[in-house]
Structure formats: C-alpha cells, structure tokens
C-alpha cells in the first residue's frame, strides 16, 4: 500500500513499516502530497524545517497518528460498532502513548506557588531540588482521531457552520455548499483510494494530530493562566508499562517513566482520588469532572469513546487577568492572596486560593459533551447551577455568542473554546459561597459539598449523604436565607442528639455532639467531620467547660463510615442541621427574613424564629428547641455575626439570597404534638377524644364485618387491623402496618406524613359546647351499643326461628349503622382540627384555603379551612361558615413528631406542627351548627352519612 509521495514513503521506510504496508491487512491512512509537506516544513508547531530535522518520535506521530488499524471507506467511518449508523465522531488511531514520552525539563513542568503546607506539591520534586526533570507521557491511553463526516453531523444535529467555527474556518461552510469531510482540521481532497490492504484518503495538509485538551491549553500562548490553574489538579504517576516499553524500545537507562494525570471524577481508571505512591483515596482532594488529559476520553460507561468527546470554555490570559485583578474574581484575591493584586503577581496570588474554591471556576468551564456544546446549541449549555451559561438576555443571537471567542483549539479528546471573558460559577454567586470561602465554616462546607463529586450516573449510590445540598443551594431562580453555624460554635456548643433524650428518662444518658473538621484518612463512605459526644445536662444546657465523654462508644471520628456505628447518627444530625438552616422564600420575595415577620419555615419544615427587631448583624434567631428552653438556665439564642448579600438585586441580576453566619446552630424542638397538647391542661378533653378509641368498640359497631371470613369469627384479620388504625390519632408501636418508634410515655400523630402541619386545639369549654349539641364521645358510643344491641340469635338448622333471627339482625344492623355514624362524626370532627401547612400568628397578611385531614368521599376532596392571617391574629372559617379566631395568648406552640429507628438511635422521619388554642370548635359540616344527631336520626341517614364522610387512611 503505497502513496506516491516521497515523504510518506520515507516515513514508512524509516519507521520499518515497509513490510507491514506491503502485506495484506486492514489499514486506513490519511496522507498528504509532497506540496503539502513543503508547506508543512515552512510552518509547523515543532519548528522543523526539513524532513531530516524530524525526530523518530515526531515521525511516529505523523505516521501512526494518521493511521487506523482497520480498513474504512470514508462514509463508513461514522458507523459505530454493531452496525450502528452515523454514531462515531472519533476513531482509535494507531499511535501509542509511548510516542508522547519525552524528557521534561524543570521549567516545562507545572509550578505551584500555594503557601499552604496542606496542599500537596506533587511536581516540586521534579521542577526543583536534586531530581530535576522527568520522563513522562502526557497520557497513557491511545490517542484518537476526530473526524467530521456529514452522516454523523446530521445524526447529532451538528451544523456545517458549527464545524467551520470549530476549525477556525473564516470562510464558513454553507448548507448549500458541497459535501465535505474533515479529519481534525484537515479537509479530505480525495477519499477511498483502494489498496490491497486497505484504503487511504488524501488530505489538503499534513495531519499533525493534536494533543489532549490539557496539553493544547498548555501549549497555547494565550491560555497560560488557565493552564497554570488546571495543572494544580495534576500529578505525575509512575507507569510501569510505559517504563518497560520505553526501556525496550530505546534501550535507554531510564529508571522511571511517568504519566501526567488529573484528579477527577471520570478518568481512564474511573474516579482518580488516590495520590501518587498511595494506596487509599484521599477524599479531601477536589476533583475535576473529568481528566482533560485523557486521550481516549469517554463521557460515561454507556457512551463509547468514539461517540463523543469533551469541550472546555477557557478564558484567555487577558480575560483571566482582568477577572482577578479588577473584576469578579478580585474578591478572591483580596481574601487569599499574599502579594499586591497586580498582573505581575497574578499566578502566585491565584495559587493562594484554596483548591476547592478555584475548583468551582474550572469545573464550570468543563463540559462533558462536545456534541451538546457546538455553537448552534449554545442556549442549552448549562452552568454549575443548571442555568443557561449563555443566557439570551446577554447573548441574543448565535453571532453574539460567537463573538465571545477569540479562537478554538482542536484536541484529540475535545475542543477548547478560547473566550475573551470569564464566566463565574454559581458557586461564587449563590448563598453557598460564604460557606466555601470562610475559614470558620469548614464543617458546613464539608456537609454541603459532600455529594458534589457523585452526581454523574451510577455514582449517586456512592454519595455519602445523598442530599446534594450544593446543587440545591445553587438554584439561582430560587431565593434563600442560608444560616451557617461557624466551626467555633459547633465545636464549643455542639448539637443536641434528640434520640438520646427520647430513648431514656435517665438524663445522664442525654448527650450532644461537638462537630469539628476532620480527616477521613482515605476511608470511603466517610465524612470529614469528627463528632465527639458530651453529656447534656438539662439544668445548664451546653457549656464550653463540658467534658467530652470517655471512650469511643458514642464518638464518630471522621474516618468512620457513615453506615456504621455512630456514623449513621452523625450523618442524620448533620443533614438535619443543614436543612434546618435553609429557608426558601417566594421567587418575588426580595426581603427574606428582613421583614416584620417573625416565624419562618426551614427547608424541612422546622420553624425558625427571629427574636430581634434588628435583621442584620446581631440578629438573634431560634429553633424550636431554643424556644422550649426559654426561661431556664439552659436557654440560648443563635446570633448572626456576618451577613452576605447575594441577592440578584445587588449582584447584577445573578444571585439567590442572603447568607448569615451564626455563632452557634439553631435546633428544632424535641416536644411532640402529643406532649405539647398534654402539657396544656385546657386541651384535656380534646386529647381524651383523640386517644379514646378502641379496636373493640369499632368491632362492636360492626366496622370489621367486611373483613370477617364467611363461617369464621376472626376479628383480628390483618386487613381489619390495618383498617382500624385509620381511626387512631396518637400512636406508638405498630399501627396499620407502619412502625412508630417513640419514647414509652409519648405518642406520634398518625395523620402526619413527614410534612408540616397546624393543629387547632379546642379548649375543654369549647368541647363541652359541642358535647351539649350532641357530639358523641367514645364512652357514649360504647354505652349506646351496650344498651341497644340485642343478643345475637343463632339460626336453627330447620330455620324454625327465622323470623326472630331476621328481626334481631335488622335491629342490630340499625343500631350499628347509627353507631358507625357517631364514630364517623367524632373522628371527622377531630380530624378537621388537623391542617396541612404550618401557619403562625405573626406580623403577616395572607388569606388562603388549606386542606384538613377530613375528606368528602363523594367529591374525593379534602375538606378545607379558610384561613386569614392579619398582623397579630389568625382567623378560621369552617364549613359551617363560622369564624373562629385563634386565642390571643396561647398560640404558636411548636412541636416535632420524630419517628426513630428501631434502636432509637436516630430519626428516620419527622413532621413539624404548630398548635393554636381555639375557644370554639371547628365544624366540618354546616348541618351540625344546630346539633349532631341528625347524622344518625335514621339508619338510612346514618348509612348515607358514613358513605359521604368515610374515614380514609
């Protein structure tokens, strides 16, 4: 297989491929004529001016890098394996990783000026000191060839103008022009020349396969700053295969050959988080989304490397200088730099920015799909907050978008778009930013970023928390108030473990945890936070002088897996704490917590109470636990020490709220709704009605009849027990197939379902008023049944007593029908006082309809209450049209129904509620304004009523 070009022939001869190219086989070559070579020698990236100046390595690049180890006609190159048409964008070349091995002089190697001793300087050994220089490949995977063929372009919606732009073709490529094909940036002039052992395709220039994106960025003259930053994520790794291959090929006395790799989520060996010469991963190393030096880059395990490549949006040096010296990145330099913020000090100053902070800038500019980021699809390119990276308001047309770029750089694993500006990540503009920047917020930073590198594909199952807090807090269309307890407060005052209080009446077992930044020491599934237990004394609360418990029984060091021992408790408490400190406001709410309103709901429904009129630095905020401690020696508040305004109104339209640094964390109440109601004696009769039901009474009333097997008397049928549970209100243990784990003397509201609620608790006087109108009690229903039910008659074998049998059954059916109506009235009466959503007596004005726990079976709709909030007052309108106003003194009682795991060591789910006293009860049916007996005035009416208001689970 020969092409009539002396340079191609010389390459074949010099590299020893004459016999290979002369034999039958399957090869594809991309070749250029002699004229193209003459032009190449006048201008090329290697600075060689004649064939004789080419090194053997360069010859291999020119020949092997333009060769495929299969025979392809041009049209078939876009087909993927298995006959899948038009899916291939790339092909694996015949080049080898060994071809890129060279001796790197010290001045060619990355330099890290960071002064923090904790940041490893992986290159220092080779760019200074005794061991200067290194033999290294820029990657150990086989280089690939990218081609632009119209079949693949049509399949992937890539326009000709996209390809022209990527190839820096100023003349363009119109849709009406002739078909073209490109291999990298070389145009195919003649395709499908047949040889005995394959095909060759003639190009319009000598094909010099580009390096990977990281190397292309490094070599480009005006992306040096970004390359410098990128290389902080890299390290040299010894490669035994490369070493032995290099020694054998060159007979060289080279002890070690390394490869340059980047710490990343997606690399040729999967997640690369293990440092050179180490065996265990270091989860404190910030990761790039993928290795930009990976020649054979693969988007995911389900997308073969031939079907796509990556893309990077890299600011040029001028843009990077402006950004850090005088624009958006200036604040980072001012916070971290050691030297004056000047162009001359730029690299040294940038290197002082912690790696996990600068990571956000780099990752935001790295996109995992070239196909989805071509210019014609610019409006679908998303930033780290999943917002448009190039919004139409700033880039109204494709032409305006393209004007951002000074050039494009073709690499063997992607395309680099060189920009004249820096696009800041949402990390720098969102409420999460202060958690990342502040040196005293490492615990919260660790928690909110714990899942960041587990977003892609199946990695979700490996995320330590599975909460993705940072993704949530970067929702730029939302508005947040984010409270961040600082490390000092978490280490001094800690966070109370509610399970320890629920699990024992012995206060000596009560504890709180002090949280500190820690080190996982490479343990997978751990979290870099230490949790040290301290005995909680209710009389004094959390005090700086409290001693950490002896032993490790209740401790959870940072290197403990979160699914083992107290690791699960630590995980649960930290998730709860962060959720409790996030408030989500309406999209048009520009003031957040800085209004006259006092009560706010956190992300998980826990109330946050603003205690002071001051709404900036010095503002005091409480959780329910702090409210329950008021007036005791253990009382405390959380005080705001710093405020960061990150609203879009003050940040050029891109922001999502305010961040408040707290001296210590808030915490939710440990009082259940049952305990809260029980502790207020004026609600005794309401509580008695809620707890007076018995399964025996329901069976006596005949509710279990549908579950009885014919010919049997099995009142304990499992289906019946599950059905009977829906009549309960406060439960403990098993109920209706669900488990409610709570302290022995406590109960949980069965109607609650991991949400937020309001309970309107009628006073005893209010209940008495309804009883006087005929509202039944459980005792009265039981007495009615005992008094009116007749002894059952067994039908004789000869049916001689048929009349008596029928009479008794008819009588008892009527009695049971009325009793069932009484039960249905009572249960719905009580349920109507349990409402979805937590509403407070507060300085707000709002009117709305809110669902209760009652349902109208005919309309299939939950019955609602019309609620009106005015400053200092909350009024209700029930289904009877009556207005009931919440008591002006006893209201806003906070409760949390926490359901613990079987071992009572951590909370598995919880519902928050606020309880208000009402001095008149609420009616779920307007017909009851004059009395309740009409619901069971006849068996027919009783059955109709039960059908309409049947109790649903």
Predicted segments — roles?
Residues 1-953:
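Mature, structured domains of secreted/extracytosolic soluble proteins
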């Amino acid at each position: 297989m020969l092409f009539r070009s002396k340079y191609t022939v010389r390459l074949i001869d010099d590299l020893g491929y004459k016999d290979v190219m002369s034999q039958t086989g399957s090869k594809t070559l991309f070749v250029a004529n002699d004229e193209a070579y003459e032009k190449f020698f006048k201008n090329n990236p290697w600075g060689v001016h004649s064939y004789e100046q080419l090194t053997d390595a360069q010859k291999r690049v020119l020949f092997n890098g333009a060769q495929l180890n299969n025979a392809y006609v041009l049209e078939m190159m876009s087909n993927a394996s298995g006959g899948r048409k038009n899916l291939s964008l790339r092909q694996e070349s015949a080049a080898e990783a060994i071809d890129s091995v060279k001796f790197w002089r010290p001045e060619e190697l990355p330099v890290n000026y960071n002064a923090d001793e904790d940041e490893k300087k992986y290159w220092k050994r080779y760019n200074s000191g005794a061991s200067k220089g290194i033999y290294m490949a820029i990657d150990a995977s086989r280089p690939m060839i990218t081609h632009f063929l119209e079949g693949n372009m049509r399949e992937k919606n890539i326009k000709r103008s996209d390809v022209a732009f990527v190839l820096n073709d100023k003349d363009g490529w119109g849709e009406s022009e002739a078909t073209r094909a490109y291999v990298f940036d070389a145009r195919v002039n003649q395709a499908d020349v047949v040889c005995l052992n394959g095909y060759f395709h003639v190009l319009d220039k000598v094909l010099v396969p580009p390096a990977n994106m990281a190397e292309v960025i490094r070599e480009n003259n005006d992306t040096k700053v970004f390359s410098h930053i990128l290389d902080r994520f890299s390290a040299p790794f010894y490669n035994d295969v490369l070493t032995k291959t290099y020694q054998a090929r060159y007979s060289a006395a080279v002890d070690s050959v390394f490869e340059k790799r980047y710490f990343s989520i997606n690399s040729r060996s999967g997640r690369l988080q293990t440092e050179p010469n180490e065996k265990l991963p270091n989860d404190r190393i910030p990761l790039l989304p993928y290795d930009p030096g990976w020649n054979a880059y693969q988007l995911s395990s389900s997308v073969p490397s031939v079907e796509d490549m990556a893309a990077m949006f890299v600011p040029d040096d001028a843009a990077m200088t402006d950004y850090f010296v005088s624009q958006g990145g200036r604040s980072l330099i001012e916070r971290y730099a050691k030297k004056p913020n000047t162009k001359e000090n730029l690299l040294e100053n940038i290197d002082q920015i912690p790696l996990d902070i600068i990571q956000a800038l780099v990752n935001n500019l790295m996109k995992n799909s070239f196909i989805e980021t071509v210019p014609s699809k610019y409006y679908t390119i998303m930033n780290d907050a999943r917002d448009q990276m190039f919004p139409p308001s700033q880039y109204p047309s494709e032409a305006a978008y393209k004007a951002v770029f000074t050039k494009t750089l073709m690499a063997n694993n992607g395309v680099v778009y060189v920009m004249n500006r820096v696009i800041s990540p949402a990390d720098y503009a969102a409420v999460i930013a202060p958690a990342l920047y502040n040196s005293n917020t490492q615990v919260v930073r660790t928690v909110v970023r714990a899942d960041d590198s587990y977003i892609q594909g199946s990695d979700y199952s490996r995320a330590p928390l599975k909460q993705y807090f940072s993704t949530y807090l970067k929702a730029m269309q939302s508005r947040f108030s984010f409270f961040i307890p600082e490390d000092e407060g978490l280490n001094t005052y800690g966070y109370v473990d509610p399970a320890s209080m629920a699990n024992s009446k012995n206060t000596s077992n009560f504890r709180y945890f002090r949280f500190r930044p820690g080190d996982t020491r490479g343990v997978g599934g751990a979290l870099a936070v230490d949790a040290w237990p301290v005995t909680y004394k209710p009389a004094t609360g959390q005090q700086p002088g409290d001693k950490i418990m002896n032993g490790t029984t209740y401790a959870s060091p940072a290197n403990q897996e979160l699914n083992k021992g107290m690791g699960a408790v630590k995980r649960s408490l930290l998730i709860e704490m962060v959720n409790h400190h996030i408030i989500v406001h309406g999209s048009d709410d520009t003031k957040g917590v800085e209004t006259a309103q006092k009560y706010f709901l956190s992300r998980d429904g826990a109330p946050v109470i603003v205690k002071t009129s001051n709404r900036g630095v010095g503002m005091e905020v409480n959780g329910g636990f702090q409210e329950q401690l008021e007036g005791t020696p253990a009382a405390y508040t959380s005080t705001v020490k710093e405020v960061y305004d990150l609203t879009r109104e003050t940040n050029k339209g891109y922001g999502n709220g305010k961040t408040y640094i707290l001296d210590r964390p808030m915490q939710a109440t440990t009082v259940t709704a049952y305990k809260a109601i029980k502790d207020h004696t004026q609600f005794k009769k309401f509580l008695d009605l809620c707890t007076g039901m018995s399964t025996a009474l329901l069976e006596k009333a005949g509710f279990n009849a549908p579950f009885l097997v014919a010919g049997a008397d099995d009142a304990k049928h499992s289906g019946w027990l599950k059905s009977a549970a829906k009549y309960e209100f406060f439960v403990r243990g098993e109920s209706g197939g669900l488990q409610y784990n709570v302290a022995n003397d406590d109960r949980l509201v069965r109607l609650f379902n991991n949400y937020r609620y309001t309970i309107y608790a009628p006073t005893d006087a209010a209940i008495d008023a309804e009883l006087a109108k005929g509202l039944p009690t459980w005792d009265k229903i039981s007495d009615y049944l005992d008094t009116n039910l007749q002894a059952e008659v067994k039908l004789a074998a000869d049916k001689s007593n048929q009349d008596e049998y029928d009479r008794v059954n008819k009588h008892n059916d009527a009695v049971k029908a009325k009793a069932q109506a009484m039960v249905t009235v009572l249960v719905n009466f009580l349920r109507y006082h349990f409402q979805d959503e937590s509403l407070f007596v507060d300085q707000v004005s709002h009117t709305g309809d809110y669902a209760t726990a009652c349902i109208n079976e005919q309309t299939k709709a939950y019955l609602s209450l019309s609620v009106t909030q005015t400053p200092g007052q909350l009024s209700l309108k029930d289904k009877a049209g009556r207005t009931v106003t919440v008591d002006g003194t006893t209201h806003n009682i906070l409760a949390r129904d926490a359901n613990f795991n079987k071992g009572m060591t951590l909370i598995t789910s919880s519902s928050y509620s606020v309880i208000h006293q009402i001095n008149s009860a609420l009616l779920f049916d307007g017909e009851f304004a004059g009395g309740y007996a009409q619901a069971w005035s006849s068996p027919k009416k009783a059955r109709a009523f039960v059908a309409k208001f049947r109790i649903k689970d």
